[in-house]
């Protein structure tokens, strides 16, 4: 469960990072991406551990709120699942059609940008 939560927060952070304040960005980056402890972040910013914890929890709620309104991550996941189904179908029914593979690769590369 904790790993799933971390993956979700990291994904939401990737989508909505520009909407966060500099402090929110810093705390989440250090906590989730760089695996700092609350104490290490508190020392880095000369604040209490509780202040870091409160900021991270508040920012997680903000990210979830953005996702509830904008659905960027959910739609991204749905498109990726559909692309996977298309790729599987093409590979099983048209294994030698390089043009179809190239078209799917192009579509997937658009998502990565």
Swiss-Prot record:
Superkingdom of this entry's organism? Bacteria
Name-wise, this protein is UPF0122 protein LAF_1235
Q: Provide the family line.
A: Belongs to the UPF0122 family.
Task: Write down the HAMAP family for this protein, in alphabetical order.
Answer: UPF0122
Any idea what job this protein has?
Might take part in the signal recognition particle (SRP) pathway. This is inferred from the conservation of its genetic proximity to ftsY/ffh. May be a regulatory protein.
Q: Which Pfam families match?
A: UPF0122
- Source organism per entry reads Limosilactobacillus fermentum (strain NBRC 3956 / LMG 18251) (Lactobacillus fermentum)
């Amino acid at each position: 469960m904790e790993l799933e939560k971390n993956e979700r927060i990291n994904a939401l952070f990737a989508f909505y990072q520009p909407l966060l304040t500099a402090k929110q960005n810093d705390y989440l980056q250090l906590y989730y991406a760089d695996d700092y402890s609350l104490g290490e972040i508190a020392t880095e910013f000369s604040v209490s551990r509780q202040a870091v914890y409160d900021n991270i929890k508040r920012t997680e709620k903000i990210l979830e709120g953005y996702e509830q309104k904008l659905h960027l991550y959910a739609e991204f996941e749905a498109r990726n699942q559909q692309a996977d189904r298309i790729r599987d179908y093409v590979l099983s029914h048209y294994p030698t059609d390089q043009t179809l593979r190239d078209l799917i690769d192009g579509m997937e590369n658009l998502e990565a940008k």
